[in-house]
């Protein structure tokens, strides 16, 4: 939208003010909306969705000479409010800033300027952002709309696989925002399909039969590699705190509060369309923040965690089974919605972003930096597995947030794909040595030792109650 039409829109909205004044007393500054997209890749996957910033030059469309046979999706929920914990710490920080007795100077001056805090209502925490709960209706980054748009894009590219179908399943965890995303995605396909939503419980009692196999892994230790990742510098945080404390005498902002300002910036964009708080940071500080997030994710839930690949391997293995059974299975479209951490586990198993050696914490990896967490799992992340046939051969490849990401040593097929039997060997080598049930002591919480829901949903009908987690 150009700026002239935004101004007209603002004027029109001003006339319609009664509908919105209970939410926001002062209107968002429309001239700022859309100007901060360059920094989304630096905001730890908390800012709105964006496409993968690099490509190998290959289109995500199936190559002309090939015919699509099956598609799978692992998706993250859309743009959301902060979690309870982050929401509470941002609210505490806001109260501290609001309590500051002098006028602000420097980067925080905007707080004096009729600023309204973007988290007035804790009941929104953990929720997807929707037209009903956002602060300003001209915000273009609403989770609801992102999910609908994704549904339409999916249908445009893969709808041919649903041609003869009147019904098909969509699998989702029972987190409310994950389910809502799946539902908005499905609703956007129109009413010619009877979609059967399979709501899979996140509870550890589900064992291996879940989209959140992390939760059922009794031995998982997110901080197992703390001795490695905690070596990363925190100087960028002291720099921010010192700068703001110098500009504003007596503010006494701590390093951890400086760290919270990044989340403030990201979530305020989700809710309002932009955030003045983002202007607090220098480009370098954003780079340090982003690398710290990449590197800690690698050790928390990625290939750097002793059980990252094992936990994601359950879902990767099920995905490989679906590919192998593409001829027999009547359903050709396997859509699954879950959280970023679970998609990170799955990507760890798949290996397309595995650098193959530990990520350094002593410095920012420059030459060898394939693991960008926010590029992999921004809000609304979408990891597609495509299976297509070209003459007499079948091929597999991944499309992550619109970019084809080839498997390094298996990309000689059309569109940088990997021939299916070679892909199966590749997958076996990734999963070799992993044993979810014994490594995770899953038997302490569950007797479900394998993932069955893709195969038994019609008999079982999964219908777990939704919750805010
Ligand atoms: C606000 O300032 C008053 C007076 O300085 C202080 O007693 C109170 O604890 C402060 N509240 C917060 C939330 O910082
Ligand atoms: C749809 O049905 C037609 C005619 O029966 C068949 O040729 C085609 O392969 C089917 N398409 C899919 C995606 O199942
Ligand atoms: C939709 O599917 C469900 C379960 O698969 C079935 O019970 C229901 O009758 C179907 N509804 C329509 C209108 O086809
Ligand atoms: C996780 O690993 C860290 C580092 O080895 C260790 O200090 C911590 O006690 C472990 N936590 C659990 C619950 O085992
Ligand atoms: C600044 O905050 C620290 C704790 O965050 C506190 O110990 C210290 O007394 C505070 N200093 C001032 C001047 O308020
Ligand atoms: C992968 O799935 C197959 C079929 O369900 C199962 O036999 C095998 O044990 C699984 N392997 C892993 C590593 O999960
Ligand atoms: C597949 O086609 C190629 C040429 O297009 C041929 O050389 C090859 O023998 C065929 N393979 C099979 C298994 O039919
Ligand atoms: C699995 O690993 C073992 C031991 O490291 C090795 O001997 C075997 O060839 C591997 N199998 C596959 C399929 O990669
Ligand atoms: C789980 O399995 C382990 C070894 O396979 C066994 O030692 C343990 O007793 C089992 N625990 C339960 C609760 O079944
Ligand atoms: C498996 O565990 C569930 C509860 O976690 C229990 O209801 C069920 O009876 C168990 N099944 C078997 C075969 O032990
Ligand atoms: C977040 O807070 C809501 C409302 O208090 C509660 O229902 C939910 O369980 C909480 N979720 C988490 C993960 O703490």
At which residue positions do the language-model features occur?
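Fungal secretory targeting signals
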Residues: 1-21
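Signature for phosphate-centric chemistry
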Residues: 18-169, 173-334, 338-469
């Amino acid at each position: 939208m150009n700026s002239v039409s935004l101004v007209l829109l603002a004027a029109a909205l001003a006339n319609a003010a009664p509908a919105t004044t209970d939410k926001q007393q002062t209107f968002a500054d429309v001239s700022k909306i859309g100007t901060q997209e360059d920094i989304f890749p630096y905001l730890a996957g908390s800012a709105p969705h964006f496409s993968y910033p690099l490509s190998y030059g290959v289109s995500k469309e199936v190559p002309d000479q090939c015919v699509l046979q099956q598609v799978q999706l692992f998706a993250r929920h859309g743009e959301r409010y902060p979690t309870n914990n982050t929401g509470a710490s941002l609210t505490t920080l806001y109260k501290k800033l609001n309590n500051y007795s002098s006028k602000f100077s420097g980067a925080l001056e905007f707080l004096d300027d009729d600023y309204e805090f973007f988290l007035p209502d804790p009941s929104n925490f953990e929720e997807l952002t929707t037209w009903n709960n956002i602060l300003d209706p001209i915000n273009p980054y609403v989770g609801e709309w992102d999910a609908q748009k994704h549904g339409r894009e999916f249908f445009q590219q893969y709808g041919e696989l649903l041609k003869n179908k009147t019904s098909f399943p969509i699998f989702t965890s029972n987190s409310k925002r994950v389910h809502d995303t799946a539902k908005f995605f499905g609703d956007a396909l129109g009413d010619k399909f009877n979609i059967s939503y399979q709501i899979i419980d996140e509870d550890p009692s589900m064992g291996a039969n879940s989209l959140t196999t992390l939760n059922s892994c009794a031995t998982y230790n997110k901080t197992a590699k703390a001795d490695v990742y905690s070596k990363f510098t925190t100087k960028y945080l002291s720099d921010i705190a010192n700068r703001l404390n110098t500009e504003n005498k007596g503010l006494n902002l701590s390093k951890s509060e400086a760290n919270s300002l990044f989340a403030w910036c990201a979530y305020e964009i989700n809710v309002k369309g932009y955030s003045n708080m983002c202007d607090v940071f220098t480009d370098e500080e954003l780079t340090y923040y982003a690398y710290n997030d990449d590197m800690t994710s690698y050790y928390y839930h990625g290939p750097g965690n002793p059980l990252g690949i094992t936990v994601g391997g359950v879902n990767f293995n099920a995905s490989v089974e679906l590919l192998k059974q593409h001829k027999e299975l009547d359903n050709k479209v396997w859509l699954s919605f879950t959280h970023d951490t679970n998609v990170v586990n799955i990507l760890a198993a798949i290996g397309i972003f595995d650098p193959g050696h530990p990520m350094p914490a002593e410095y920012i990896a420059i030459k060898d930096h394939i693991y960008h967490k926010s590029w992999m799992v921004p809000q609304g992340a979408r990891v597609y597995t495509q299976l297509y046939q070209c003459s007499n051969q079948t091929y597999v490849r991944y499309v992550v947030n619109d970019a084809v990401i080839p498997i390094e040593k298996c990309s000689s097929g059309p569109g940088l794909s990997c021939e299916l039997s070679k892909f199966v060997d590749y997958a076996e080598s990734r999963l070799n040595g992993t044993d979810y049930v014994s490594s995770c002591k899953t038997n302490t919480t569950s007797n479900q030792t394998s993932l069955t829901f893709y195969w038994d949903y019609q008999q079982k009908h999964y219908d777990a109650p939704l919750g805010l987690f």
